[in-house]
């Protein structure tokens, strides 16, 4: 849906809370400028999330290298979406974040609802941003303001 966010909002005539818009304030509050985006391959590789962060918020989200993207995508679809939580998969996520923070990533975005099943904020030395929680909070805030 977020890939077509503006079109959806225009068609239905009500405000759509873009997931990147609900995540950006927390990224900025943490002082991050180049967080690592972990998500499905589509979300990491296409520009609807990264581009939105860059164009609307000045945040340059990074993504892992191609092999790591493929493994993260596989873990999400073949394990997490099936309710399978494996220690070696958690270690893969942690290692990807370690590699990318060594290259300059200053935070980590959980860009898929299932990632929070595998890793938690306390697993990382950099700030993390669980988009599921942040998006839900933005929707609640909007509902309470209306």
Question: Which residues make up each language-model segment?
Answer:
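Non-catalytic structural scaffold of enzyme domains
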Residues: 1-146
């Amino acid at each position: 849906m977020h890939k077509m966010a503006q079109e959806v909002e225009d068609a239905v005539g009500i405000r759509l809370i873009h997931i990147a818009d609900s995540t950006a304030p927390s990224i900025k509050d943490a002082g991050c400028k180049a967080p690592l985006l972990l998500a499905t391959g589509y979300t990491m590789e296409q520009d609807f999330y990264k581009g939105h962060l860059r164009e609307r918020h000045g945040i340059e989200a990074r993504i892992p290298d191609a092999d790591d993207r493929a493994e993260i995508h596989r873990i999400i679809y073949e394990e997490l979406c099936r309710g399978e939580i494996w220690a070696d998969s958690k270690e893969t996520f942690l290692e990807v974040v370690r590699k990318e923070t060594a290259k300059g990533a200053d935070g980590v975005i959980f860009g898929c609802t299932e990632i929070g099943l595998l890793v938690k904020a306390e697993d990382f030395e950099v700030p993390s941003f669980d988009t599921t929680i942040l998006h839900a909070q933005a929707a609640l805030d909007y509902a309470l303001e209306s």
